[in-house]
């Protein structure tokens, strides 16, 4: 099962966050990082990162920029907005070329071993349908915005239609922040 989280890394005193789908297995985590992302670049050489379990809206925010209220555990950044954060040491890196419906891409598969975790005192909010749609928009946005991923024109059109459809629903069921985040993604992709 793929779990959507926010990964936080640090390189040269600069913090980075990104929404990533990860696989949890016992005390390990496995994630696939696309070439060209800051997280890929950071974890090419850095050995520590955090996995942040956050509200869905924070996953969508993470696709747009690295600004956040960071806390630190042994110089590993994690998000103040997390329900909890798990800290990992990279134990394996594998590089593969992938060709799927999203196009051709270079992946780095990271395996991390858990070294610690912290639970924050953040209270969950009720789930809104716009939360899930924003996460789906963020996944599509991250693929369309990454210039290193070559996407077939038909798939690109389908993804563009999906992101517009999700936005139309968010406008009906989401709050102000949901709508603003969705509009920013569409604007950045020149779809609005």
Residue spans of the language-model regions?
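Eukaryotic intrinsically disordered, low-complexity regulatory regions
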Residues: 129, 135-179
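Ordered, amphipathic secondary-structure segments that act as subunit-interaction surfaces
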Residues: 46-97
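Intrinsic-disorder/low-complexity, polar/charged segments enriched in Ser/Thr/Lys/Arg/Asp/Glu/Gln
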Residues: 28-30, 48, 83-85, 107-109
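C-terminal non-catalytic accessory extensions
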Residues: 174-192
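Hydrophobic residues positioned within well-ordered beta-strands of beta-sheet architectures
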Residues: 5, 18, 86-88, 108-110
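Flexible glycine-rich active-site/ligand-binding loops centered on an Asp-His dyad
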Residues: 93-151
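N-terminal structural module
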Residues: 1-48, 52-59
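Exposed beta-sheet edge/beta-hairpin loop segments within beta-rich domains
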Residues: 76-80, 96-102, 168-173, 177
């Amino acid at each position: 099962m793929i779990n959507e989280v926010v990964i936080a890394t640090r390189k040269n005193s600069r913090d980075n966050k990104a929404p990533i789908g990860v696989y949890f297995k016992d005390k390990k985590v496995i994630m696939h990082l696309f070439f060209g992302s800051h997280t890929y670049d950071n974890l090419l050489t850095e050995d520590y990162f955090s996995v942040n379990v956050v509200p869905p809206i924070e996953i969508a925010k993470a696709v747009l920029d690295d600004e956040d209220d960071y806390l630190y555990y042994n110089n590993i950044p994690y998000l103040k907005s997390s329900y909890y954060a798990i800290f990992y040491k990279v134990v394996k890196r594998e590089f593969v070329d992938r060709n799927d419906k999203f196009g051709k891409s270079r992946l780095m598969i990271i395996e991390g071993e858990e070294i610690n975790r912290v639970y924050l005192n953040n209270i969950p909010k009720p789930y809104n349908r716009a939360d899930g749609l924003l996460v789906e928009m963020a996944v599509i946005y991250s693929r369309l915005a990454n210039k290193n991923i070559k996407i077939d024109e038909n798939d690109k059109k389908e993804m563009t239609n999906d992101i517009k459809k999700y936005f139309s629903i968010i406008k009906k069921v989401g709050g102000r922040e949901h709508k603003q985040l969705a509009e920013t993604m569409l604007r950045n992709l020149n779809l609005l």
